[in-house]
Amino acid sequence: MNNNRVIFKVFPEHRIIKAEISDCVFDAIYEFNRKFLAHSTSSLSLSTFYCQDEKFIMPNTFSVVVRCHPDDKFDEEKGKRLALNRLADKYTKSLNKHLENILNAIDESLYELANHL
């Protein structure tokens, strides 16, 4: 997850911090191409045009809300760190799930291809 894409919204009067990242739809496909095909000598890559299956595309936006307990002192920086960590966990779980879906689809396709040879 690129932290530069994270937007924080701070509501001190409600003791709430919201962290959000957008434009994540094709992140799993981009990550697959970067991790698994970057060192390939061919021009092979997954195209976002051909990977419109819901199993491969991530939600567009991820967000988390962190609330400060009434007995605690509201600390904006601490809240932002906590929100960022929770957002990163949520995003990473989804990314890993979608990468696994891509790898499973490739595995199934290779199995079918091998059976046709």
Where are these regions (language model features)?
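Catalytic phosphate/metal-binding cores of nucleic-acid and nucleotide-processing enzymes, i.e., regions
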Residues: 1-117
